[in-house]
Design a protein with these regions (language model features):
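Conserved catalytic/acceptor-binding region of the Class I
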Residues: 169-233, 240-254
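A short SAM/SAH-binding and catalytic strip from SAM-dependent methyltransferases
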Residues: 139-152
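A short acidic, Gly/Pro-enriched loop at the edge of an enzyme's catalytic core
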Residues: 129-141
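N-terminal, positively charged/glycine-rich alpha-helical extensions of SAM-dependent methyltransferases
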Residues: 1-28, 42
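A short glycine-rich, Lys/Arg-flanked "PGG" loop and its adjoining helix->strand segment in the class I
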Residues: 154-166
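Class I SAM-dependent methyltransferase SAM/SAH-binding core
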Residues: 57-131
Length: 309
């Protein structure tokens, strides 16, 4: 009997355990360094201004330290907001932020009004690939700069759709292929290992949404460039937010002084106007959960309308 054949893991795939560890270690340094995440989150929030939806239940998938959870709670008073993250230290930091926010609100408002104006958010430590939220139906799923850390995006989109109500909104951001192209190029000059994540193209994401059953997907992209005084400042900021090399093909030992110096020298040659640039291709997407077209068993649903007499 022939031995079963198993596909070798792709070295460009993300190691989920390494991601959890990195973000767990970064829980205490994340807020001070998350410049890009905060700016992109603010732009996401602005895009909600034109959305005609008053959600009663919201999921923040990949909530990190919980900044967006508080902003969504303030934007939609009375809504049930659940923050979910795979890294327990991040979830604990988000809980602490929520407690501080609720305490401040109660000092500013009368206790009865504060309780009526803003429901306390809830937090869950779990994997976005398998949401442990049976029986919970959301009007909105929000996810800011999380999807780039996940390998099986069709599965993730299917989970989001499963937990949304009909007519519910998925709104998300992620990073596209040009992200950290300077750092990727510098490492390529130093050695042959994978050092930067693989990022999915905007058009492929739109196709995945349609294939997952979402309706009316809208995709957009913009490039943002952050600049740094030197290469070490860039690397230190990435480490502070947990964005370290978590690919399966990452080197397990130290890089070596000679190769490290080659990488730093390659980044130095990219210096413009005295600063080291780092490009981020930010992808924005939203889509809606429409009426189901098939039963859970896979049978097509045909709606019949009664003719007027």
């Amino acid at each position: 009997m022939a031995e079963p054949q198993f596909a070798a893991p792709d070295p460009r795939d993300v190691d989920a355990r390494a991601v959890r560890r990195a973000f767990g270690r970064a829980a205490t340094t994340y807020d001070a360094a998350a410049v890009l995440q905060r700016e992109v989150g603010a732009r996401m929030m602005q895009r909600l201004d034109v959305v005609k939806l008053v959600p009663h239940a919201i999921l923040d998938a990949g909530c990190g330290t919980g900044e967006a959870v508080g902003e969504l709670s303030a934007r939609y008073p009375g809504a049930r907001v659940i923050g979910l993250d795979a890294a327990l230290p991040m979830v604990n930091a988000a809980r602490m932020r929520a407690r501080r926010g609720n305490s401040l609100l109660r000092r500013l408002l009368s206790p009865l009004r504060a309780k009526a104006d803003m429901a306390a958010p809830q937090f869950v430590c779990a994997d976005v690939n398998a949401l442990p939220l049976e029986g919970v139906a959301f009007d909105m799923v929000w996810s800011n700069l999380t999807l780039q850390w996940l390998n099986d995006l069709p599965r993730v989109f299917a989970e989001f759709r499963r937990t949304l109500k009909v007519g519910g909104l998925l709104t998300f951001t992620t990073l596209g292929p040009d992200t950290l192209k300077e750092l990727r190029g510098a490492f390529a000059r130093a050695d042959g290992h994978t050092h930067v994540n693989r990022f999915v193209d905007m058009h492929d994401l739109g196709d995945m949404l349609v294939q997952s059953g979402f309706a009316d997907p809208v995709m957009g992209m913009e490039q943002m460039t952050l600049t740094y005084a030197d290469p070490r400042a860039l690397l230190a900021e990435l480490k502070a937010i947990g964005a370290t090399n978590a690919t399966r093909g990452r080197p397990r030992g130290l890089m070596g002084k000679a190769r490290w110096q080659r990488m730093l020298a390659a980044l130095e040659r990219m210096r413009r106007d005295g600063r080291i640039p780092a490009t981020f291709e930010v992808i924005y997407g939203h889509a809606w959960k429409g009426e189901p077209k098939r039963t859970p068993e896979g049978h097509p649903i045909v709606k019949l309308q009664r003719r007027p007499p």
